[in-house]
């Protein structure tokens, strides 16, 4: 399971011109689910996202997690994160989870995160437009 996380001052996701998810300060989490993923991996990734210390403390050092920074999460499914780009000039999505499993684990990941923080979401398998203001910029690739 893969999360591309970006520290943001604001982010939103639109579907068909309508904003369906929006946050202020927090993390934009682009979530990719792979074939071998399960709830145990989702638990580990949620724990990592919620506790990853990438927000500045009073000394301007990355020492606070999103919970300590009183931030929010915007979680958006993105199957392209599971792409295999090693060969050729076209990505292969053979490592990606089938849609039913990917949706189940996406919803489960959201549920686990929502137990700790305010969460907004995208729409699974929809064509979405995501806009954000990356604070830093600060972006990390988390893989469990």
UniProtKB/Swiss-Prot annotation:
Q: Which Pfam families does this UniProt record tie to the protein?
A: Tyr_Deacylase
Q: Which residues form a coiled coil?
A: none
**Which InterPro entries does UniProt cross-reference here?**
Daa-tRNA_deacyls_DTD, DTD-like_sf
Hydrolase: present as a keyword of the record? Answer: yes
* Keyword Hydrolase attributed: yes
Per the UniProt record, which EC number(s) apply here? 3.1.1.96
CDD domains from the xrefs?
Dtyr_deacylase
Where it sits in the cell: the answer is: Cytoplasm
Q: Which Gene Ontology molecular-function terms are recorded?
A: D-tyrosyl-tRNA(Tyr) deacylase activity; Gly-tRNA(Ala) deacylase activity; Ser(Gly)-tRNA(Ala) hydrolase activity; tRNA binding
Can you list the GO cellular component terms from the UniProt entry? cytoplasm
Protein family (similarity comment): Belongs to the DTD family.
The record describes its quaternary structure and partners as: Homodimer.
Q: What is known of its domains?
A: A Gly-cisPro motif from one monomer fits into the active site of the other monomer to allow specific chiral rejection of L-amino acids.
User: Which PANTHER family does the record match to this protein?
Assistant: D-AMINOACYL-TRNA DEACYLASE 1 (PTHR10472:SF5), D-TYROSYL-TRNA TYR DEACYLASE (PTHR10472)
Q: What is this protein called?
A: D-aminoacyl-tRNA deacylase
């Amino acid at each position: 399971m893969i999360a591309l996380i970006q520290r943001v001052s604001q982010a939103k996701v639109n579907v068909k011109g309508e904003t369906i998810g929006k946050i202020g300060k927090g993390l934009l989490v682009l979530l990719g689910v792979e074939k071998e993923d399960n709830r145990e991996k989702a638990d580990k990734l949620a724990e990592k996202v919620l506790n990853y210390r990438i927000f500045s403390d009073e000394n301007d050092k990355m020492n606070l997690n999103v919970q300590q920074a009183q931030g929010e999460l915007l979680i958006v499914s993105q199957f392209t994160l599971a792409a295999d780009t090693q060969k050729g000039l076209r990505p292969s999505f053979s490592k990606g989870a089938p849609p039913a499993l990917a949706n189940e684990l996406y919803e489960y990941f959201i549920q686990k995160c929502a137990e700790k923080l305010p969460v907004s979401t995208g729409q699974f398998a929809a064509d979405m437009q995501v806009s954000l203001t990356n604070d830093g910029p600060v972006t990390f690739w988390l893989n469990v």
